[in-house]
Amino acid sequence: MGKLVYGLGNLEVEIDDRVLAHLQIVVTAKLRRNEGFMLTWTDEPSVGDGRSSIWLHQAIPLHFKYDTNEQPEINRQWLEVLTVSASNAVGMRLVEEPVKS
């Protein structure tokens, strides 16, 4: 499991390396265009089994920490789903990877 470290280390979220790689691509593209957005995910049962959201903006430090050094194969369809969701009013929701078609 990798980690998304938000802010100055105030929040660390464990995320599977494959999910994290896709998230990093979409987040980087959005922030390069100066587009802040909300990111929401479902919490693990160990932290309450609820939902969490953070505001992503280029002024807020963000660190993607991977458990392995292997680059996973990128699913372009998943990138599209994440990108579209990041552009809507409620922001990006981490969703399951769609089956490649």
Where are the language model's segments positioned?
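N-terminal intrinsically disordered, cationic/polar leader segments
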Residues: I15, H22-I25
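Short, intrinsically disordered, mixed-charge
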Residues: I25-R33
